[in-house]
């Protein structure tokens, strides 16, 4: 980072409102702070204590690069937004951002921010800041006490105030004091108790009435710093007055007091009066500063109270508005609730009506089904098998029977079982079959299954009769008493002893074969037209 061209130099350029350049001479150590023993003195305006007395220092390393070191400052040093550790050197590159302290409240950037730049010295001539002179940077020497001062302080005993840093009268003035004016000196008012009492009262007033300000209250902070300065000045003047009195006491007690001239005594008295007047002025100024600080504090309290009152009013307005919105919302919810209750009530009423209608329809359906069952049982039932017509057949006399039942009946009689009219024609009644099927479809599943089983059983019986014919052997003279049925296969029709069964009662034969009682079929139906007693054989 050494200069490459003539006239080029390194400097710290301030960022923000004020454009200032701090020159960094090669090979020299540059210090920044608010104290007197620094290269460039920084005077903060927003917060006086933001910058330390010796805040940081800049110097070049062996490679010619500039480095920055935090001198254990209170508010720190930042390089490119990163805080540096105290007493540790950090190298800087061109364009590096150096921040001293932290940003004050309600501000985004710190008051002192610098950027390391490299420019021609001619361009920087108008914005360069002059460093402090060497005499201000020199350290102050400590005051040396003579043997007489040491003895005097030892004779007087311990004092509550420190004596260094204050002016003392010369030895010539001490020798010019005269004993003839001792009474005049004793008539002078004593300043020590007055000054110390005033100082104690001022300290009490400051501690009782002044509250330590925060960094947000910059005005009160500045005023408080002035108050502290005046208090220091009052202490210094008070110590000077005490020293003068101690010197006068020494002069009075010395053996050379008779040799003191009147002029020197008057000079000392004049100096004491001047110090007393100066102290009085400082006290008045201090009281005025305390009064101003109190007024500032009261103004801040009033402003805070007014802001608090405004905030409370604003919060009350927001609360009232929120309550109003809540009330409106509750009203809307109540209206919606009432509407929903009305809708639910209407739906319940509609549901009840629908339920009643369904019950009525179901009752009507039950009534229709019962009527259909009555019709099926009374009008569409075969008189032979007492079941609903299966393949209904209508005779010439208009009576209807099952096809299987009438065929079985015709094997014994060729006349209608109801009206005894001769059977001439048989007609299939598809209308009855379709009507019965439609009505059965609307009945219970048990009825449907029962009818399907009957139809299947009838088909099996027809197929069995077609495959195995039955031979009926009967005696015409004794048919009503004894009847024999012998069944055999078609291949061996002459043998009649394989499978047979016998029934003795005529009623049982009629119920088994035709499904009707003897009240409808009498014994005359089975009498033969032939009067001769002979055996007859019927093969089915």
Curated annotation (Swiss-Prot):
It catalyses: S-ubiquitinyl-[E2 ubiquitin-conjugating enzyme]-L-cysteine + [acceptor protein]-L-lysine = [E2 ubiquitin-conjugating enzyme]-L-cysteine + N(6)-ubiquitinyl-[acceptor protein]-L-lysine. A zinc finger (RING-type) spans 382-420. Keywords: Chromatin regulator, DNA damage, DNA repair, Metal-binding, Nucleus, Transferase, Ubl conjugation pathway, Zinc, Zinc-finger. Residues 128-205, 517-540 are annotated as: Disordered. InterPro entries: FHA_dom, RNF8, SMAD_FHA_dom_sf, Znf_RING, Znf_RING/FYVE/PHD, Znf_RING_CS. Residues 30-84 form the FHA domain. Pfam families: FHA, zf-C3HC4_3. GO terms for cellular component: chromosome, telomeric region; cytosol; nucleus; site of double-strand break; ubiquitin ligase complex. Residues 152-162, 179-200 have a biased composition (Polar residues). Pathway: Protein modification; protein ubiquitination. Its EC number is 2.3.2.27. Belongs to the RNF8 family. E3 ubiquitin-protein ligase that plays a key role in DNA damage signaling via 2 distinct roles: by mediating the 'Lys-63'-linked ubiquitination of histones H2A and H2AX and promoting the recruitment of DNA repair proteins at double-strand breaks (DSBs) sites, and by catalyzing 'Lys-48'-linked ubiquitination to remove target proteins from DNA damage sites. This is E3 ubiquitin-protein ligase rnf8-A. It comes from Xenopus laevis.
């Amino acid at each position: 980072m050494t200069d490459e061209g003539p006239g080029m130099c390194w400097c710290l350029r301030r960022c923000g409102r004020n454009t200032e350049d701090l020159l960094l001479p090669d090979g020299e150590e540059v210090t920044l702070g608010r104290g007197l023993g620094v290269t460039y003195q920084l005077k903060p305006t927003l917060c006086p204590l933001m910058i330390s007395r010796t805040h940081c220092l800049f110097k070049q390393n062996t490679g010619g690069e500039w480095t920055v070191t935090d001198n254990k400052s209170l508010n720190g040093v930042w390089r490119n937004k990163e805080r540096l550790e105290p007493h540790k050197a950090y190298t800087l590159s061109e364009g590096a951002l150096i921040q001293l302290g932290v940003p004050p409240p309600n501000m985004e950037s710190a008051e002192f921010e610098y950027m390391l730049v490299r420019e021609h010295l001619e361009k920087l001539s108008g914005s360069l800041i002059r460093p402090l002179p060497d005499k201000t940077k020199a350290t102050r020497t400590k005051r040396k006490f003579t043997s007489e001062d040491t003895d005097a302080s030892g004779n007087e005993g311990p004092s509550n105030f420190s004596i260094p840093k204050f002016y003392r009268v010369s030895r010539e003035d001490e020798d010019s004091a005269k004993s003839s004016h001792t009474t005049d000196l004793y008539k002078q008012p004593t300043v020590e108790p007055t000054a110390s009492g005033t100082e104690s009262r001022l300290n009490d007033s400051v501690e009782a009435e002044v509250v330590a300000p925060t960094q947000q209250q910059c005005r009160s902070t500045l005023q408080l710093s002035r108050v502290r300065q005046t208090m220091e000045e009052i202490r210094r003047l008070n110590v000077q007055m005490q020293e003068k009195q101690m010197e006068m006491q020494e002069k009075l007690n010395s053996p050379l007091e008779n040799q003191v001239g009147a002029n020197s005594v008057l000079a000392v008295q004049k100096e004491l009066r001047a110090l007393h007047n100066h102290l009085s002025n400082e006290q008045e100024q201090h009281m005025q500063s305390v009064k101003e600080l109190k007024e500032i504090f009261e103004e801040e309290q009033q402003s805070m109270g007014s802001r608090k009152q405004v905030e409370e009013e604003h919060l009350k307005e927001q609360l009232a508005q929120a309550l109003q919105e809540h009330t409106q919302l509750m009203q809307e919810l109540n209206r919606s609730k009432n509407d929903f209750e009305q809708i639910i009530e209407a739906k319940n009423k509609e549901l009840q009506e629908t339920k009643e209608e369904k019950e009525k329809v179901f009752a009507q359906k039950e009534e229709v089904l019962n009527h259909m069952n009555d019709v099926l049982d009374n009008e569409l039932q075969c008189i032979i098998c007492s079941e609903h017509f299966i393949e209904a057949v209508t005779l010439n006399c208009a009576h209807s029977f099952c096809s299987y039942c009438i065929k079985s009946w015709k094997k014994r009689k060729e006349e209608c079982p109801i009206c005894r009219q001769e059977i001439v024609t048989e007609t299939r009644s598809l209308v009855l079959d379709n009507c019965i099927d439609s009505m059965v479809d609307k009945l219970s599943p048990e009825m449907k299954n029962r009818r399907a089983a009957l139809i299947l059983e009838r088909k099996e019986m027809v197929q069995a009769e077609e495959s195995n014919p039955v031979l009926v052997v009967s005696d015409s003279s004794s048919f009503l008493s004894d009847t024999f049925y012998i069944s055999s296969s078609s291949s061996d029709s002459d043998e009649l002893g394989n499978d047979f069964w016998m029934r003795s009662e005529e009623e049982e034969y009629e119920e088994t074969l035709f499904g009707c009682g003897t009240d409808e079929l009498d014994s005359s139906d089975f009498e033969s037209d032939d009067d001769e007693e002979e055996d007859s054989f019927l093969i089915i």
